[in-house]
């Protein structure tokens, strides 16, 4: 399975953001570029949250996504948030994955509304990666807001859990891209 983008164009008013963008993603890959170059717009088009001016996107089948805004259920714990999409995921499995990304027992007991920004990012990333039904993954700046020492653990979890699914990880962080070791497409 592949995500195929063909001649995608998008402008905001008279400002072009994407011009005849073409790309085939059949494995985990990184989309890099400076802030404001259209990376998030591209993800929003892939997910059907925004329309392109022209061009086509095919193959975004049953996606799981991490957005720049964390979209956790605030009243649930981080583990309960993971279990929402991780059908068959046990509470013990969810807590084990969260502990691997630095969660303590006390933090595991908190509702998502009381977690720090970095904790929410880690939980949102794991929720997407553990989504058993997802055939594609779209991850928008998933390591933003994480402490530097946790980024390596988050990268390792991303590589392990994404597997070979077509995955697009958007970042402007060259260090994270290098740690992933995935092919990079510059925008």
Language-model features: where?
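Walker B catalytic motif
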Residues: 111, 141-142
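Conserved ABC ATPase "signature" region
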Residues: 91-107, 129
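A short, flexible loop at the N-terminus of ABC-type nucleotide-binding domains that lies
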Residues: 1-21, 51
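Helix-to-loop junction immediately C-terminal to a conserved catalytic motif
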Residues: 47
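Hydrophobic anchor residue at the start of the ABC signature
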Residues: 125-126
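Conserved ABC ATPase signature
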Residues: 111-115, 119
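Q-loop/switch helix immediately C-terminal to the Walker
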Residues: 69, 75-93
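ABC-family nucleotide-binding domains
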Residues: 140, 147
């Amino acid at each position: 399975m592949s995500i195929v983008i063909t001649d995608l164009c998008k402008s905001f008013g008279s400002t072009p953001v994407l011009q005849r963008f073409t790309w085939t993603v059949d494995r985990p890959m990184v989309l890099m570029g400076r802030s404001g170059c259209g990376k998030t717009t591209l993800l929003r088009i892939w997910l059907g949250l925004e329309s392109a001016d022209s061009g086509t996107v095919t193959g975004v089948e049953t996606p799981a996504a991490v957005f720049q805004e964390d979209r956790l259920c605030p009243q649930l714990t981080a583990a309960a948030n993971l279990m929402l999409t991780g059908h068959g995921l046990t509470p013990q499995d969810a807590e084990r994955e969260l502990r691997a990304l630095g969660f303590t027992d006390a933090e595991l007991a908190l509702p998502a509304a009381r977690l720090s920004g970095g904790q929410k990012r880690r939980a949102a990333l794991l929720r997407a990666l553990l989504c058993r039904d997802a055939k594609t993954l779209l991850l928008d700046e998933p390591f933003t807001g994480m402490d530097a020492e946790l980024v390596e653990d988050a990268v390792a979890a991303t590589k392990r859990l994404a597997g070979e699914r077509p995955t697009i990880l958007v970042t402007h962080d060259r260090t994270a891209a290098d740690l992933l070791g995935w092919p990079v497409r510059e925008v």
